[in-house]
Amino acid sequence: MITASRLVLARKRRGMTVTRLSQLAGITTRRLGDFENGKAKPSPASLTALVGALDFPESFFHADEVADLPPDAVSFRAPSKMTASQRDIALSNGRLARQLQGWIGDRFRLLDPDLPSLTTFSRCRTDSPADIPMPGQTAEGTPPAEEAANLVRARWGLGHTPIANMLHLLEAHGTRVFSLSRDCADVDAFSFWSLGTPFVLLNTSKTAERSRFDAAHELGHLVLHGEEQIPHGPDAEAEAHRFAAALLMPAADVFARAPKNASIEWILTAKRHWRVAAMALAHRLHELGLTTDWQYRTHCVDLGRLGYRKDEPRGLQHESSQVLAKVFGAMRLEGVKMSDVARDLHLHQADLNDLVFGLVVTAQEGGRQPSADPVTNRPRLSLV
């Protein structure tokens, strides 16, 4: 007997419609619909055809239910660019990442989440009063999202210094960070809460600077928009964008360093200080009033001409997960192979690798089987 919801999950993970899968598997759409709704059980021949078309281990379809991840529970970065297929692939990545996190959590004690709840700083939530001043709104009009970023910096002891590694910062405060699969190119990033645990999934095909900003953007969604009644739309995206800019380029540091009417040459040098994209720094200078509208437009044109609109010449190296690297390192010492993890999760190693920043292919396979340590003896991962 197969788990019908896993058949749906596998199909969506591959970005297929019911029609497309029925064509590949040689099964009528009506019959496939019966399989997915649990009204009928596929014959051995039909199951073999589905396994081949979807490229999942057969055991995947017999395992327990995987908790759903509805679109309304997720904050997507730049959702307007997504097709339905890309959204399905992304959400399926999130569900599988949550399964992997459960596997890790059964064997390691990870850091507890330490994200402040700053939902009262959001103007997008339905429970935020619109007729009274927002917390953090100063007489000078500092946007609440910017003030929220300042509070996060203060709580985490960051001061006004640049953030050296955005992924490590998220993980140091209990956020579970995973990577998106390569067939999810149109999704920059997304985040969600699951039973009090924050998750962020990032697209690793973007520039390192873009990924850092996406990670900060998703942190903005997590702290500003909360776990329930998550707001969506342009206003929520604008809030998370302002939060990310303020977190990575705090106003106090920008004002202390940036000249009025900064040149392109200054931007290309200073972006390395904050470890951000040149376009992001140009936008930050403008929103802080350090450049005029005309200067900002000129900067954008000049940076685009130099190749900085979609790329970051001579950019940073990509950040990766410190927690996952430590987990896999500890498993190697115990003789646990990546194939063991994939087997436990009923996945191919390639699908596992997609979730973990490519760390599977760089891990050295151990030889012996792991010992069955009780959960109470799980090693605790601590970040420096």
Task: Describe the residue ranges of each PLM region.
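Short juxta-domain linker segments that transition from a proline/glycine-rich
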Residues: 1-384
